[in-house]
Amino acid sequence: MEKDFEEDLGLVFDENMLETRTCKNNCVFCFIDQMPPGMRETLYVKDDDERLSFLLGNYVTLTNLTEAEMERIVRYRIMPINISVHTTNPELRCAMLHNRFAGSIVESLRYFADNGIGMNGQIVLCPGYNDRDELRRTLNDLMGFYPQMASVSVVPVGLSKYREGLAKLDKFDAEGARETLSIISDIQDQMRSQYGTNFVYASDEFFLLAGEALPDSSYYDGFPQIENGVGMMTDFKESLDAALSEARGVRGNDVSRRVGIITGRLAADFMRDCAQKASAVSGVELSVYPVTNDFFGEDITVSGLITGTDIIRQVPPGADCYLIPENMVRSQSHDLLDDVTTEDIEKALQAEVRIVPVDGAAFLEAMK
């Protein structure tokens, strides 16, 4: 069976066929350690299972793998393997993962690369740990594994308000975000001149934190890391622009509908720009409602971690319909992270709530 990185496997099991291999690390940035008590059990499961990397696209640290298991991956061509690299500095990786066996990452990557196993990498960037010179070192090391290491994403650490007893971590500010983008740009220049690819991609959040414009789609080389929030906003904008070009001149209903767009604070200005363009073409009255994350803490600004409780408390009624992105709800359900459902939100806001794919054309269609 062959599949691209972003493709679903296409198989659905009636029940869990695998006993999930749990994580043996204690990463300084782990978001599960920052969850409040009392949520559903599945949200506290820390998986670090290479089988789920292939089946579901999950990222793994490789600290769970034995030599025999690595040989099996090579023998059966189980790929791509999505790897949480974070740093290639052995001592730093052991310290960040709190695992004395975590330092052999370069040797593991070399083994897979030498045997033709495709990989994608992820770096959760923590100020004062693996940023700046350490980031440059890590990216230089990972460049050496191209093309088997096909792409690398760099995402900022997420910090909730539930950090009592955990390692002290700082969030990125504008200056740190700009410095990170500069380092990534230097590596991209080298990779483009040598291989014609950017190879490493900053998450959307870094551009917004830095106050820089989002790049166009050519920056992302086909969006290999879009599931990590890398290029999602650019892809949305360009698909919306294309849909608006097709719809231009085809006016919507004579009676204006009022549609509310619910999002996180991070994307609020971006969604306002999109709403203004869509409203001008569709005739729909669009209002954007950015939700402050009181549940996890106001430093969590992405839409995927918004809870139903915060929506009900903050979003005013009055629209004919409300749109929420599908990354706010659990897969194949209407449940948000706090088990509040879209039906609960509909009752509170006295209007329909529509779950919309993170796609500009779907967004335009949903407001009809």
Where are these regions (language model features)?
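Conserved Radical SAM active-site core
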Residues: 1-148, 158-187
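Auxiliary Fe-S-binding modules of radical SAM enzymes
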Residues: 5, 9, 144-145, 158-368
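Conserved residues at the C-terminal ends of beta-strands
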Residues: 33, 84, 155, 203, ...
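Structural preference for beta-strand elements that scaffold enzyme active sites
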Residues: 80-82, 118-120, 151-153, 199-201, ...
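Short loop/turn and capping residues at structural boundaries
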Residues: 84, 123, 153, 290, ...
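Short glycine-rich or small-residue beta-strand-to-loop segments that form or flank ligand, phosphate
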Residues: 122-124, 152, 324-328
